[in-house]
Amino acid sequence: MGHLLGHHLRRAHLAIWRDFNENVGHGGLRPGQFGVLSTIDQNPGISQIEISRFLDLDKASIVALIYRLENLEWIEKRQAKEDRRRHELFLTKEGKKHLKILRKDMQQHENRFISRFNKTEYNQLIELLRRVYLNND
């Protein structure tokens, strides 16, 4: 199995997942939820469909992520003024507070892995991984 790309990607994913759960995933927070929080913070008023496209996640997954973040009272939905069928998403005061902490924890989490590479190796790794998941039709 040592020659299989999928095997190595899975092991790398598990190592990153475990570290996230131990050091960032306070209260059961998952990486996808961090991604949603960050996306809403950078794009206040974004819709669930737009988040789904931006993060390349299916709509059912986004609904579950949004539901959990709403229950934590970290985000809120507001009906759009121009289209009452559309709901816009915003961070709450509590969500902004937690995201600030999470970003610090997330940077430390990332640094634990990034520090294993020099800048050239890191950039090359990112480029190679992008080749795996982009244009995968």
Residues of each region from the PLM?
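Alpha-helical DNA-recognition elements
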Residues: 22, 68, 131
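Charged, amphipathic alpha-helical coiled-coil/dimerization segments
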Residues: 17, 49, 67-127
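The alpha-helix within a helix-turn-helix
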Residues: 52
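N-terminal leader segment of winged-helix/HTH proteins
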Residues: 1-27
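Helix-turn-helix DNA-binding motif, specifically the short coil turn and the N-cap/start of the second
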Residues: 57-61
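Short capping segments at the starts of secondary-structure elements
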Residues: 43-47
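Short alpha-helical "packing" element that flanks the helix-turn-helix/winged-helix DNA-binding module
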Residues: 36-37
